[in-house]
Amino acid sequence: MKRDFVDLWDLSPKEAWEIVKKTLKVKKGEEELGKPLSGKTIALLFTKPSTRTRVSFEVGIYQLGGNSLFFQEKELQVSRGEDVRDTARTLSKYVDGVIVRNHSHTWLKEFANFASVPVINALTNMSHPCQILSDVFTLYEHYGEELKNLKVAYVGDGNNVCNTLMVGAGMFGLKLFVATPEGYEPNSYYYKKALEFSKENGGSVELTNNPVESVKDADVVYTDVWVSMGEENKNIEAFLPYQVNEKLLSFAKSSVKVMHCLPAKKGQEITEEVFEKNADFIFTQAENRLHTQKTLMEFLFREPQA
């Protein structure tokens, strides 16, 4: 039976932990993934621009022995009105898996439901599970098992990254404090899912509109762009108190690490000074997309055991 990765909860917490821990062994050279994609072709179907997601997946597919085909939506008949169900069923006859980056989460779920091959969410307006799985790996690589004792603060827009980070906190047992402007809170369904997972795994997720309250004594401060692709009409003024700058970080621990999923709009959600001070950690975070996604693909495309 095929496995999709449309939302983070398509993995059980146990499976997610296994991927994170295996990724560390592979990155250290203690374990090899081999060539699980040998003889396989993976399609990348993107409607949104991408640097890290596209390159990390294409390189990862190659390193796992597979071939990749990249398509923008405008190159396919779906852009002229073909039923998403028909596109999914057609591509499933040609390729062994599809990685989708699409504005609509509903569209992606419909595509996955009708595809007969594994489908991976490479970002929608609602969810970014590959990013958060990789981010948890970055924390695990740096802090080890202590990551469960960390205070992680997310400051900014309650967007797709924030939605999935909440779920990730619940699944991995992290303590997450989310601060967003009023009216820009994260999705209520993802918050509900995060609370459900938190009860099972010992984590916590708290929401506030006060950025100082969120970052107070934080070990990690995470931010993302205030204006995502296709959302250019936001009230930037409402976000100004949520900028990750030296003043805001003065309320966090002196050893605080800053995370950003990139691309960064320096001077908006984060200052140039803070970004450059934390550049090593931020670009390790970016690098880890490759390592984590390779382990994820090995898991999803693994041949079933007899």
Swiss-Prot record:
GO molecular function: amino acid binding; ornithine carbamoyltransferase activity
Cellular component terms (Gene Ontology): cytoplasm
Gene Ontology terms describing biological process: arginine biosynthetic process via ornithine; citrulline biosynthetic process; L-arginine biosynthetic process
Residues noted as binding L-ornithine in the record, renumbered to the chain: N160, D224, S228, M229
Name of the molecule in the record: Ornithine carbamoyltransferase
Pathway listed: Amino-acid biosynthesis; L-arginine biosynthesis; L-arginine from L-ornithine and carbamoyl phosphate: step 1/3
Entry's transmembrane regions: none
Binding residues for carbamoyl phosphate: S50, T51, R52, T53, Q77, R101, H128, P129, C130, Q131, C261, L262, R289
